Amino acid sequence: MDLFVYQWFCDGSQEIRAYAVDSDSSTVCVRVTGFRPGFYVETASCQAVTRALQDFRDVSAEKRVRDHLYATRGSSVPFVWVTFRCWFDARKASDVLVKAGFACHQCRAQPVLQLTSLRDLPTCGWIRLGKGAVQVKREKYSRCKREFIVQWEQVERGPDVPQPEVTVVALDLEVNSEVENAMPKDRPGDEVFMAGAIILRPGKKPKRVLLSLEADDYPEAEVLAERGYAVQQYPNERSLISGLCDMLSSVKPQVVTGYNVLGFDIDYLLKRCVRLGMEEELCLTGMAAERPAKERTISWSSSAFGAQKYSYLDWEGVVAVDLLPIIKRDYKFDSYRLDFVTETLLGSNKDPVTAADIFRAYATRKMDVVGEYCVKDVQLCVDLMEKLQVWVGLTEMAKVCRVNAFTLFTQGQQIRIYSQVYCHCEKNGYVVTDPADGKRVPWGQDPPVSDEPDEDYIGAHVVEPSPGIYDNVVPLDFSSLYPSIMIAKNVCYSTRVDPGTPGSETFTWEDHLNCVHDPRKVEYERLSSELWDLDSEARELRRERDAIPRKRVDDRRLVVDTLNTVLDAQRMLRTTRAALKNQLGTKTVCACRLLAFLEPATKKGVMPTILTDLLDGRKRAKKAKAEAKDSITKITMDKRQLAYKVSANSMYGAMGVKRGYLPFQDGAMTVTYFGRQCIEKAASIIGSEHGGQLVYGDTDSNYVTFADAKTPAELWDKAVAVAKAVSSVFPPPISLEFEQVIYTKFLILGKKRYIYLSCDRDGNSSGKMGFRGVLMARRDNSGLARKAYSITAQALLEDRDPWADLTPLMKDMYTKNCSLRDFVITKQVGSWCRECAFIEQGADSIVAVGDYKIRDLEKAKAETRKITGTDGGPEYMAVLYKLVMAQLPGHVQLANRMIGRGETVADGTRLEYVVLRPSYDGKKRRFRGQGLSERLETSDYYKRFAEFLELDTEHYVKTLVNPLDQLLTTAGRPEDEFKAFYGYRVNYRKVVEDIKTLRACPEMVKIVSFKKK
């Protein structure tokens, strides 16, 4: 019998449960019995281990000889493999053995990983049950249509065919807030009063249901049927939630999805059930008939998913799929609100229903409009899921990474790498030692010295470019450079040996960054010394100038001219020094490296083998996609090749961490060193042997021009030939590839910052501009800023006057003919400490506020003592919090103000805000000294009070001065061209404000008369 497993589950008992769908898309529960989880103990004595575990029942110990994954820790080492009845016993036993002085390994590997590794089973995919599988007819554990009990030896990998469809329920809750203008916070009156659901069953039409409290304005059933949904009304919140639970129990979905369904809907539903004393009813909506799901709280962050913190239910047989973190990972949007996302990806718009409308609907019992809005929101989630093929992508990624699909939401990248490494090691005689188990020591003893260096290492090589516009540039990239280096040079935990070992390759180099051997650091110190001398000279000149009587005009002018020359030199040196400091960064490295790894012919490493399998798997998937005749296979193969690619590129990152599952900085620094060598060698060969000029080199890419190529076709063929010739110099699979595009115009501003126009071999161009690292690529700029930058860059690349396009845009800005969306700036808020938590901690324990450093904590403490007259206590901490918050970025201060107004701002939220205009002081003839942070407000707040507020157009223009002037100067335009325009506008605005003040209140304006000389 073949089944498609979509979830493995182990609660620590003596059986592992697999939830699967058959070819008819019905849910099947497979109860795998007889499997004994275990771990390795580093000792040669089975008796010593069994004596230490004499209080445990049914312990099995077997002596095995294995290699450590970390080769420096030994090979052919005696271990004892210890197995237990269940995972509960295994975890307790590992603690007992560690306290007894034994080193235990692979304690991280949970039973599901051990079983799927031992039997080569997919974590998401087809399995086959042997003839020994017994169908359970009575006293079933689950509510599945069919249930089987099978010994673990009777389960094997199934055929690789397209997966069946699954039953999906998409959800969206509408919740009241008893506090006006504040988000719901599970207060008594913050009731769930509406739940929209769409049920998607394979082969059937979608069923749309709206569960709602009783309302006065729902139309007749026939009208609702024309809209495409039915309404079920309930007298109170308890019965509504009970109805929702009954629906989930009857439908038995394999997937529950929604937009922010983990971050809000399920979390909030659970809180309301706890408040109403009915949490068990919700917890029993999974596939387990008698075992209620347990509440879990997760908190983690990654560069892909950002900060993740939520509570969820560990349902058996039901996978919660949240669309929000997936879209955050795959798309860089200004905003992740559902209306913006669907408009961008689907071209669909949400109904213009606000939070106030929702709260009003609850209060007035006029719920029809909000109900239709709720169902449409759920439909948008369904459309997003189908368009992005989210479920197929998750299952393919889970299969490649050897983890459950839900683990992709609840844990970061390292568990995926660990699972793949574990599976390979288990089959090939390695024991996975990692810092959390192999290095654990008994209580009272000092931990052993770490194998890994504490110092940093130098990263990828970037060639400092000469800013300017270049014609006909071709990009030549190394394909999967770091994975290819790991394969070619056999860089792995398992191949690290002492230098000079027969059959090994030795790498030796020096890393110098920000140390006395770094030429840039030497130059930085020289500039600092010169600036010190110039400061002394400037002080002397000022004293000399002040000592000269004003009547001696010529003598005084001579000294002033000399002083101005010194000040100009200072400014130039400070600019140069600042650029150097930016290059040097804060990291300091000063080391001589000497590392060796076994050659592939001697012994192929674990990581190179895994990477080879991943890259080969990707090639097979891409080939299968090209040959596929049906859309399902095409989609599956596309998602699979993407999963292989992401997983392969993540292997290097797992080694480079200082702390984690499998840190190995020796390997990471060797890979980056050889990567730098590859870039430099390729650039040298391209220049010396093929007549190419290197414009820019970055990590794994070279941007080159060839003067002898006169047409796009010649340049194209030349690039292909050069890439092939250079690739032959490097060991496979390292290869340089032409990216199949010509940059007809390439404007480079600095490292990782460039703009281009491209064409194909025939010279055909779409005219669309590409870019990287410039203002347009950053989401924390307003739409107007990006629009102004874009039209300026486009004009420069097309050799047109940028002011022809820029002037109308500036006119629209100043005359307020732009939409509010153009003025909105978005920025992500990290984690920061709320006031109540801050006050509870002591002043001495304060180092940072969540993710944010405090610029001058001592100054804030001194001011607090001055204000409160105390050195501690709640009042002191409350004042200190306000002063510390004033040192944080403006958008964080805005988030804190929003919380003070009763709004909810979760960590990782992207705030949408605008900059408001400061008030003008007519008496002092200047704008009041409001800081920028005080003038930030959310776009929603501005909409509500737009008649009393005004946007600060000058601020938006000011943010363009440096970027546009750099762009214009790089393209050969006059210096400070846009700065002059901005200065004119500032002066014009001051004159206008003075005139307004004079008309309104003439006595407040100081009239200065100038006498004729």
Curated annotation (Swiss-Prot):
Record key words, sorted: DNA replication, DNA-binding, DNA-directed DNA polymerase, Nucleotidyltransferase, Transferase, Viral DNA replication
Pfam families: DNA_pol_B (PF00136), DNA_pol_B_exo1 (PF03104)
Catalysed reactions listed for this entry: DNA(n) + a 2'-deoxyribonucleoside 5'-triphosphate = DNA(n+1) + diphosphate
Keyword Ribosomal protein: no
EC number, UniProt record: 2.7.7.7
UniProt xrefs under InterPro entries: DNA-dir_DNA_pol_B (IPR006172), DNA-dir_DNA_pol_B_exonuc (IPR006133), DNA-dir_DNA_pol_B_multi_dom (IPR006134), DNA/RNA_pol_sf (IPR043502), DNA_pol_B_thumb (IPR042087), DNA_pol_palm_dom_sf (IPR023211), DNA_pol_type-B (IPR050240), RNaseH-like_sf (IPR012337)
GO molecular function terms noted in the UniProt entry: DNA binding; DNA-directed DNA polymerase activity; nucleotide binding
EC class of the enzyme, as a word: transferase
GO biological process, one term: viral DNA genome replication
Function: DNA-directed DNA polymerase involved in viral DNA replication.
Family the UniProt entry places it in: Belongs to the DNA polymerase type-B family.
Name of protein: Putative DNA polymerase 060R
